[in-house]
A protein has these predicted regions:
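Beta-propeller blade signature
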Residues: 107-112, 153-164, 244-260, 308-313, ...
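C-terminal structured "cap/appendage" subdomains that terminate the fold
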Residues: 302, 443-538, 542-547
């Protein structure tokens, strides 16, 4: 999420103008990052997941081709949190992306012709796919969505040439199906033992246990390891699933070729609050206490920024980046998150003012690390909730939640922020408050500029060192996507972002939900009742450059 381009700087960013725009034609939540390869920009829309190619060599970047996968309309009915898609990946002349109805597709980047299509899941049991694939060597890494539908999470690698599934690893169940074998050496004792994906669950609960893989994955070519997070256990009613509920709400390191697990760490054992573990893992090499370390940075929904040794899985530090009252910290000796008993949810009893809420102190929206400033730029939420556990039964293909939730703003009344965080010192350097959750990704550049968008539709540029606002532009709809920057054929630097409010946070607008029902969108509507007053649905690409 960092670019070495530096034509746009803190001094001249105020002069940015719109270079061109493009309508996606679908007014749902747009979470994708525009992808630029060989003078062509590629964009994947929300459902129906149309892939567009724009010609950057011509004025106005006209449409070169579009590919329409025509996913099943029924997939919209089982999507948890809007019909979003987080974008495409590229390698060896092909574009790879997922459809809401569980296909991974490869398309020829020059012609837009389908190369292969592989069915990965089944919408009839509640599975969907929303993540952006990750390219690693000759493979494509993908995973499923549907943690609120009682599905069983998995991650898989496909052959780039043929689309054949090379390996698939489940997030729950016996070691043989989780691809846990002799090479598995977790750092902490609580992750050691045989078939923990079964024994840390009651009876056969692991079969509907969640642990979906819908967020971000990272690949270290030197170690040949892929790192990815697993989502919440199902259902949200934690009393129905006593135990740690392995291997949910944590991070796996796996051999990219075989899928065999090397280590696992659980951010949220026996996840009580739907805090998952799917957020981004940023790979950095640093000096830590006088020793070189290969580390990863993981800002989790539970509100802690984890600094981890990515070779061993050891937690080196875990520092809060937003307000937390549901836990007191992470025990670095055991690796365990320390829950606050008074905030633990209970059956048929409302526990009030739990912070952070289920979307966490940040959700999927990716942060950005700048090696120039040494800061991590974290777009995050500032939300609390009232929560009550209720009994729920599993019916295939239907919601499997078991909780009543009402979210609300955190202390101070704002609902989001973006901050510059020094992970070496474990402290925030600056923070900019936002009225709504900062649901877009962050982009840092070598020009010491940080770009991000707001749910009202403002696209903003901040000084990377101080957080000072340098420039902003009002787009037609709220921004929940990932800004990107690129060097065009004319040699100039451009910045691109999709506008189109939605996602879990913006479902009240994109789904036209009734604000009187505060439990709608899994309780998010209660915190977003005023969002329809400031933005409307959309689906538009905006690209900016200097004059």
């Amino acid at each position: 999420r960092y670019s070495g381009l530096d034509e746009i700087t803190t001094d001249n960013v105020k002069n940015l103008k719109v270079a061109f725009t493009f309508s996606l034609g679908y007014n749902k939540g747009q979470e994708a990052a525009p992808l630029v390869i060989d003078n062509t920009m590629y964009i994947v829309s929300s459902y129906p997941n149309v892939l567009y190619a724009l010609d950057l060599t011509k004025p106005g970047a006209p449409l070169k081709w579009k590919y329409e996968p025509k996913p099943s309309a029924a997939s919209q009915g089982v999507a948890c949190c809007d019909v979003v898609n987080r974008g495409a990946a590229y390698a060896n002349g092909k574009l790879f992306f997922n459809t809401l109805d569980d296909f991974t597709i490869a398309v020829d980047a020059k012609t837009g012709k389908e190369a292969w299509r592989t069915k990965m899941g089944d919408i009839n049991n509640g599975e969907t796919m929303t993540m952006a694939p990750l390219v690693m060597k000759d493979k494509v890494f993908v995973g499923d969505s549907g943690g609120e539908m009682g599905v069983r999470g998995w991650a898989a690698a496909l052959d780039q040439s043929s689309g054949k599934i090379v390996w698939r690893a489940y997030s729950t169940g016996p070691d043989s199906e989780a691809l846990i074998g002799a090479d598995f050496k977790p750092f902490y004792d609580s992750d050691k033992g045989k078939d923990l994906g079964v024994s840390t669950w009651p009876a056969d609960a692991w079969r509907q246990g969640g642990g979906t893989v819908w967020g971000w994955a990272s690949y270290d070519p030197d170690l040949n390891l892929v790192y990815y997070g697993t989502s919440n256990p199902g259902p949200w009613n934690a009393d129905m699933r006593p135990g740690d509920n392995k291997w949910t709400s944590g991070i796996f390191a796996r051999d990219a070729d075989t899928g065999q697990a090397r280590w696992f760490y659980q951010f949220n054992p026996h996840d009580i609050f739907d805090h998952d573990g799917v957020n981004e893992n940023i790979l950095v090499d640093i000096q830590w206490k006088g020793q070189p370390r290969k580390v990863l940075l993981h800002p989790d929904r539970n509100g802690y920024l984890y600094l981890m040794d990515r070779v061993t899985g050891e937690v080196l530090s875990a520092n809060a980046f937003d307000y937390i009252n549901s836990s007191t910290g992470v025990d670095l000796k055991t690796g365990r998150l320390q829950y606050v008993k008074e905030k633990e949810t209970k059956p048929n009893e409302v526990v009030r003012d739990i912070c952070p809420a289920p979307p966490g102190a940040k959700d999927w929206q990716p942060s950005s690390f700048s090696p120039k400033t040494g800061l991590l730029y974290i777009p995050h939420n500032h939300l609390c909730m009232d929560m009550e556990e209720v009994e729920v039964g599993y019916i295939e293909g239907t919601p499997y939640v078991g909780a009543n939730v009402h979210m609300k703003p955190g202390p101070g009344g704002h609902r989001g922020a973006i901050s510059g965080f020094d992970f070496m010192q474990g402290k925030e350097i600056w923070s900019v408050k936002e009225s709504f959750p900062a649901w877009s990704g962050a982009l840092a550049t070598a020009g010491n500029v940080v770009f991000y968008g707001t749910m009202e539709g403002w696209f903003k540029a901040l000084d990377a060192k101080t957080g000072a606002l340098l420039w902003q532009f009002k787009t037609g709809s709220g921004i929940i996507s990932q800004p990107t920057t690129y060097k065009a054929p004319d040699g100039k630097q451009y910045v691109a972002v999709l506008s189109g409010v939605g996602g879990w946070a913006g479902a009240i607008v994109s789904g036209q939900l009734d604000k009187r029902d505060g439990t709608s969108a899994l309780g998010f509507v209660n915190a977003m009742k005023d969002l329809p007053d400031v933005t409307t649905p959309g689906g538009e690409l905006y690209v900016f450059s200097l004059p």
